[in-house]
Design a protein with these regions (language model features):
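RecA-like P-loop NTPase motor core of helicase/translocase proteins
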Residues: 1-830
Length: 830
């Protein structure tokens, strides 16, 4: 064990306040200290240049002073018996923490819920000196009659139980309001806003009308005698898409504008093209469609630009459309069941999507952050529509307060100097490091050392390792948009290394008859071009020239869909749940069911299909089992969709730039959900691991041991012949192999063949992985408490004989030689 290794990475019980934490200070060895870790975040200027050796992206640690102040006061308030709360609140708090509760709540859940209750009901002397910053509105919005509303953000790591916190606070608010209708601190109408249909469907259990099937009974959040009172409240689940005002015109683009509702005018530049579309943030119209929309009164041409040949190239237009009024929009969102009720409690799930864009112009680093320009534009459109929709609710009905829940409540861009910083209204923090120390999530293992001897190993940040090795033509100019084949030329090596480990893990998992699920491998790419080439290489065995075949059998689509490709466009189109493309809908069902072997069932054992699945399966003539059941590898652009709750991810590779620790946490977070929550004899959760290459996460304090759950014994059956049936015996020859006579001989003049030098200092064949490392130079880099594991090509090579490799090389050489113009020898002779 070296200076950074410890016998037990998980320090705390998930059900109790952390008693210890790893104290990390620049220039010092990490030490185990008593008490809870102070709340802080790591900030790096997104415009800062990466450091040498492929760059550090950790940034500077900055204390969250408001969170630490609130945390201290909540602890005192809790110790003194929650002074100031109502009788209903006190009953719920005691119910959640009672002795003998079978489904104990995680401390992370209790801490977040109690913090919000404290800020609402805490006695004034405890709240003294605590001021939560309000969100700033622009002067234009104020002149339009909008006003801000209180926001409280709880930072909770992926897998720490945000949905349960929403259920706890929904019950608290509704029951208090029902018991005292005049108390404006509480609301009996709760609007839950989420980013996509996946989360919306999963949050259906927050509806009190579900009764015994609701989260309140499944997780034992509300005593049975209070359920009738809880059912008097309303929990509304909506996608952010509903906040976009509906147009009142009908009949398509050729129809006349219906002048009903509110007129909205916008200016934009349109490029005249061969088809009507939107690409890379630009709008294209055919000449025919432009003329049609002008005739319909939808567009007014303000200016024109012609090309050298005199043809119309671009037009600046003013578009005019009529949309529903704010009153109609709010009534549509809240529905008739709510009536005219006011003082709405808002809950934003994945709240980093909901903030005010300060400027319209994009940031220089935007494409590196989101992967593709379209994805960035979609994100900022979502943020704008989401927050402006809440503004309308506040203006017409009033918002009690807004609860923001996210693992990463940060500004992602277009907010000036606030980019990469947390929301100023963050009041509670139980982040990834805390979740790791409490065992709530898997422990990521990252590259810490390889054969190159460099301070930062290449596979720690694969993108920055590859780019300097590319030629200017391969790199793709100043925008660094490399050719996919050039990326794969170097990336195939780390993929083979982790792929070999994945295959071994799949074999180990298959020995457990109680859980037939396979481990899942994820590759996150910069753009759709790289994702396409990778997918064809992995799933279809189509290797680009000069790239060896992948030879990972579990990734090939031979009759089953073992590997899928998920583009950001597919995710965005299906987020609203209203896509008209059947294949896009099917891909959404596939992605949502990765790691699930069967549908949940009702009390009589009938499968509970998600809305629309059964009809789509029948229409496409496909089986009705979960379509993601057999998926073992996902090639994606971006970080996959929020709410993706697959718990069987074991390996992740990033093939894209990472400009912030925020983005690293979002990508790695997709693989951190635990497969099991069994508590060990010491009251702590057992370790689970996810191996990660290419995602430069520098704020993880440690890694886990490789020892997982002991393999289950396989039940064996002895097969033998029955003597009385010997006359039915059938014999077969034992064939050990086949030999084919080769009459043609090919000789090679080795003297004229250039030498191939294998350089382990350039492409590392061995990599060591573990957690965070503080080196003697006093800067954050990879290491920390925990043992080191080796990642090599041993597992990848283990199942391949030398003779097989020789024939593979001969086949590749033959294919390349035959493709050359000067080759005159028929392929069959070679």
């Amino acid at each position: 064990m070296n200076a950074y290794e410890v016998p037990q990475p998980i320090l705390n019980s998930p059900f109790e306040e952390p008693k210890e934490h790893w104290h990390i200070v620049e220039g010092e060895t990490p030490t185990q200290k008593p008490g809870r870790r102070p709340a802080m975040y790591f900030y790096r200027d997104p415009k800062a240049k990466p450091e040498k050796d492929y760059g550090s992206v950790a940034g500077t640690a900055i204390e969250l002073k408001l969170v630490n102040r609130i945390r201290d006061q909540v602890k005192k308030w809790r110790t003194e018996g929650y002074p100031g709360v109502t009788r209903t609140t006190h009953e719920l708090l005691q119910w959640w923490r009672r002795e003998g509760k079978e489904q104990r709540l995680f401390f992370a859940q209790l801490d977040a819920a109690e913090t919000i209750i404290f800020l609402t009901e805490g006695r004034s002397d405890f709240l003294q000196g605590i001021n939560i910053p309000h969100e700033e509105l622009s002067e234009v919005r104020r002149q339009q009659g909008f006003s801000g509303f209180p926001r409280y953000a709880c930072k909770m790591a992926t897998g720490s139980g945000k949905t349960t916190v929403m259920g706890m606070l929904a019950a608290w608010s509704i029951l208090n309001k029902v018991n005292d209708r005049g108390d404006a601190r509480f609301s009996d109408v709760i609007l839950v806003v989420c980013p996509n249909v996946t989360i919306r469907n999963r949050l259906q259990e927050l509806d009190p009308t579900e009764g015994e099937a609701s989260l309140y009974r499944i997780r034992d959040l509300v005593p049975s005698h209070l359920m009738p009172l809880l059912s008097q409240g309303r929990v509304l689940l909506r996608n952010w898409h509903v906040f976009e005002p509906h147009a009142t015109q009908t009949g398509g683009v050729s129809a006349r504008v219906t002048k009903a509702g509110v007129e909205v005018r916008t200016k934009e530049t349109i490029t005249i093209g061969s088809k009507t579309t939107t690409a890379r943030g630009r709008r294209y119209l055919t000449m025919e469609d432009l003329e049609r929309q002008v005739r319909a009164g939808m567009l007014t041409v303000l200016s024109e630009e012609t090309g050298k040949d005199g043809t119309l190239g671009k037009v600046t237009v003013e578009s005019r459309r009529y949309v529903e009024s704010d009153t109609a929009l709010v009534n549509r969102i809240l529905g008739q069941e709510v009536g005219g009720k006011q003082n709405i409690l808002i809950m934003n799930d994945e709240a980093h999507h909901a903030y005010r864009i300060v400027r319209e112009n994009k940031d220089e680093e935007e494409e590196d952050l989101f992967g593709e320009e379209e994805e960035a534009e979609e994100f900022f459109k979502e943020a704008t529509v989401w927050i402006e929709g809440l503004d309308r609710v506040q203006k017409l009905r009033g918002i009690n307060f807004c609860l923001d829940l996210s693992a990463t409540p940060y500004f992602l861009g277009r907010v000036g100097q606030h980019t990469n910083r947390p929301f100023p209204w963050v009041v509670s923090d139980f982040g990834l490091i805390d979740a790791i120390e409490s065992g709530l999530v898997k422990i990521p293992q990252l590259a810490v050392r390889d054969t190159t001897g460099k301070e930062i190993p290449g596979y720690f940040n694969i993108w920055h390792w590859i780019l300097p090795q590319l030629t200017p033509a391969e790199r793709g100019g100043k925008k660094a948009n490399p050719k996919p084949e050039a990326i794969l030329k170097y990336a195939h090596h780390p993929i083979a290394m982790l792929g070999g480990l994945w295959e071994k893990e799949r074999e180990d998992w298959s020995k457990n008859p109680e859980d037939p699920r396979p481990p899942v491998f994820i590759l996150v790419c910069k753009n759709t071009q790289i994702a396409k080439v990778l997918y064809e290489w992995l799933a279809e065995d189509k290797a680009p020239t000069g790239i060896p075949p992948v030879k990972i059998g579990g990734f090939k689509n031979n009759g089953t869909q073992n590997t899928i490709r998920v583009d950001s466009k597919v995710v965005h189109e299906s987020d609203s749940g209203e896509t008209k493309n059947d294949e896009v809908s099917w891909m959404r069902f596939t992605l949502d069911t990765v790691g699930k072997t069967a549908w949940p069932t009702d009390r009589v054992g009938r499968p509970l299909y998600p809305e629309g699945f059964k009809e789509l399966a029948e229409k496409l003539e496909r089986p009705d089992h979960p379509p993601g059941r057999d998926v073992q590898c996902i090639v994606s652009v971006g970080m996959l969709t929020e709410g993706w709750d697959c718990s069987t991810v074991t390996h992740i590779i990033g093939l894209r730039p990472f400009m912030s620790q925020l983005l690293c946490e979002q990508v790695v977070g997709r693989g951190l959900r635990r497969a099991s929550y069994e508590v060990g004899p010491d009251g702590k959760l057992t370790e689970e691991v996810a191996k990660v290459f290419g995602v430069p996460f520098e704020v993880i304090p440690f890694k886990s041991s490789t020892q997982g759950q002991p393999p289950q014994h396989v039940r064996r059956s002895n097969v033998h012949a029955i003597p009385t049936k010997s006359r039915y015996e059938i014999t077969f020859p034992r064939v050990e192999g086949y030999t084919q006579a080769i009459r043609n001989r090919v000789t090679v003049d080795w003297a004229n063949v250039a030498s191939l030098v294998l350089e382990p200092g350039k492409i590392p064949p061995e990599v060591e992985v573990k957690g965070l490392h503080i080196n003697n130079k006093g800067r954050l880099s990879l290491s920390g408490p925990g043992r080191i594991d080796d990642v090599t090509l041993k597992e990848f090579r283990g199942k391949r004989r030398t003779q097989e490799l020789v024939f593979d090389l001969a086949r590749t050489l033959t294919r390349d030689y035959v493709a050359q113009k000067q080759c005159t020898v028929p392929a069959h002779q070679l």
